[in-house]
Amino acid sequence: MALQGWLESLKAAQKTCILQDGRRKVHFLFTDGKEMAEEYDAKSHELIVRKWRQKSGLGAYGQWQIEVGDPPLPGAGTIQPDFLKESSSNPTFTRKDTKSSFQWRIRNLPYPKEVYSVTVDKKDRCCIIRTTNKKYYKKFSIPDLDRCHLDLNENAISFAHANNTLVVTYEKPKEILSIEEELQREVKSMKATTDGDVECKTQ
């Protein structure tokens, strides 16, 4: 069963934990060589960041791919002319979950709520945001459901719009809540170091 398989992968992964800047940072090294790093609020235990990376065929680590949390700023760490920088008025797509739902925020969308539609494509296993004025279109998957081979549910998705931000919410199925609860128990039981700015790593 895929659901049980993902849970077993989490349990079998090498894990290290560090408390830093009010966050519990957990690093997972899976048996296939992939790495996952998660950051939780140390008080509320809500997930703030989840990112992945894996080695290339040459053995070099690739860049971290953000799954949950704010993506790095365009051009962060590089110097580039102003005319090459991404406009701050462009829509930005960010996933920020709550304990009961997956949630995405698309900022810089000034159109009224009635312009938007959010649907589920079960065949392609993705959610689709459309606008009647053809100004915005976005397809995105829910990796958590893919990892557990869980079907998308049209009734679980909803959206709201305020302050130029579209908020799309997908209620977590009970299977995901069960896995997250079990993972939280394991994470909370881990001995966390508090050694300053040392990044969580598994040797």
Curated annotation (Swiss-Prot):
InterPro entries in the record: DPCD
Pfam family, one: DPCD
Gene assigned in the entry: dpcd
Name assigned to this protein: Protein DPCD
Entry's family note: Belongs to the DPCD family.
Species per Swiss-Prot/TrEMBL record: Xenopus laevis (African clawed frog)
